Amino acid sequence: MDIIFYHPTFDTQWWIEVLRKAIPQARVRAWKSGDNDSADYALVWHPPVEMLAGRDLKAVFALGAGVDSILSKLQAHPEMLKPSVPLFRLEDTGMGEQMQEYAVSQVLHWFRRFDDYRIQQNSSHWQPLPEYHREDFTIGILGAGVLGSKVAQSLQTWRFPLRCWSRTRKSWPGVQSFAGREELSAFLSQCRVLINLLPNTPATVGIINQQLLEKLPDGAYLLNLARGVHVVEDDLLAALDSGKVKGAMLDVFNREPLPPESPLWQHPRVTITPHVAAITCPAEAVDYISRTIAQLEKGERVCGQVDRARGY
């Protein structure tokens, strides 16, 4: 069994050594331009077209939760990956717990009005503020996949009213489910906090725009943990300036790194992190990949395969 590996920033040698220990029967090598030798599996992140084109692979593993970079390249270069080759993504591998930490910490930050107290501190102003009531602080999760379900589970501990919106209806205990475009307005109408965990597909690009933001309650909050292309940044800035949106915590952006001239940097109601909400945990990723390859070799059914038409 031959495995090729490519990641533009990971410690390639570490990955190769750990993969060799986890899959001792495999010959694992770092892919370099010009390497056209045979391979059974490819482990990749933002791979060059040349790496995958024309190969008779058993499977490709994207080393992250999103596969939009591969799918966008496939649109421009359909020869990059044969339709018969299954594409897998890392559904969790430690990222779910990181998303839980990020989401819960920020929701509590807003619920306890720490954002307001920070602004008061900046002007040396001492003024206790009325508390928010938990029953009025509904959390809405856009996107009800693996990571969305993890975030919902963690927020249930804090007894916030929860709702989710997705393409198809979900049956999550304690979470009100909305499905389809026809139910999006009803979903948004009660969301004091909107957490975006949607996949990046043509149908979701620019979905968080003026029209969507206007359907939120006045003074709502936005937490974007998915992709920058989901948000029309000018529309968000306008909503922040008008007070329609009271605050935004943004981990992802249309352009990354976020340009220094972006007005988001200096906005008093925006908090920025550099795409770190959930980072691939190497040890857990290797465990998932090695188990999945073993299942594929035995002809067993596996989880995490991407539906290329849907984009996730």
UniProtKB/Swiss-Prot annotation:
It comes from Escherichia coli O7:K1 (strain IAI39 / ExPEC). It is found in: Cytoplasm. This is Glyoxylate/hydroxypyruvate reductase A. PANTHER family: 2-HACID_DH_C DOMAIN-CONTAINING PROTEIN, D-ISOMER SPECIFIC 2-HYDROXYACID DEHYDROGENASE NAD-BINDING DOMAIN-CONTAINING PROTEIN. Gene3D superfamilies: NAD(P)-binding Rossmann-like Domain. Keywords: Cytoplasm, NAD, NADP, Oxidoreductase. The gene is ghrA. SUPFAM superfamilies: NAD(P)-binding Rossmann-fold domains (SSF51735). It catalyses: glycolate + NADP(+) = glyoxylate + NADPH + H(+); (R)-glycerate + NAD(+) = 3-hydroxypyruvate + NADH + H(+); (R)-glycerate + NADP(+) = 3-hydroxypyruvate + NADPH + H(+). One of its GO terms (cellular component) is cytosol.
